[in-house]
A protein has these predicted regions:
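An N-terminally biased module of ancient metal coordination in phosphate/nucleic-acid-related enzymes
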Residues: 1-78, 156
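Extended substrate/RNA-proximal surfaces in nucleic-acid metabolism proteins
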Residues: 53-157
Length: 157
């Protein structure tokens, strides 16, 4: 029987792009730990806040940080495959964005982070619109949202 392949689908390891790795050295250290723990692939998911940064600027910054991370892994002999996605903070504007730039690379899966304590207006309509466009929202940190854990049916409306 072959060993299972571990994949980290939600990490903040790109250098200097959000609250994860502060620089290239931190990225290398964290990816070495991932590799030592048996992780063979990662999906870099830096935070995207529509209200703070335009989508194109975000995509360019992520691409630059990704390039630095990949080159560092090659230089250091780290054998962890890496792709990009994003952890997208909920906004009612989501259905109007080019979501392909935010999805897990090569997929239609989009990682969405909801506000922690406030049930956002329009959540049902926004998630439904995303689904109608052919994308599948994946909720990050669902355990943090009392309005979801207390009423899971909310997500099925």
């Amino acid at each position: 029987m072959s060993e299972p392949i571990l994949i980290d689908l939600h990490c903040h390891l790109l250098p200097g792009i959000d609250d994860g790795a502060s620089d290239e050295n931190a990225t290398v250290d964290l990816l070495r730990k991932e590799e030592a723990d048996g992780v063979r692939a990662v999906m870099f998911t830096p935070h995207f806040y529509y209200e703070r940064m335009g989508l194109d600027s975000f995509a360019e910054n992520r691409k630059a940080a990704y390039s630095v991370a990949v080159k560092a892994c090659q230089r250091e002999g780290i054998r962890v495959a890496a792709k990009c996605g994003a952890e997208v903070h909920f906004t009612p504007a989501l259905p109007f964005l080019d979501l392909s730039k935010l999805c897990f690379a090569g997929t239609h899966y989009i990682l969405v982070e909801l506000p922690t304590n406030v049930h956002p207006a329009g959540i049902e309509e926004t998630l439904y619109s995303i689904l109608q466009r052919g994308y599948t929202p994946i909720l990050a940190h669902v355990e943090r949202f009392p309005y979801v854990t207390e009423n899971p049916a909310l997500l099925y409306n």
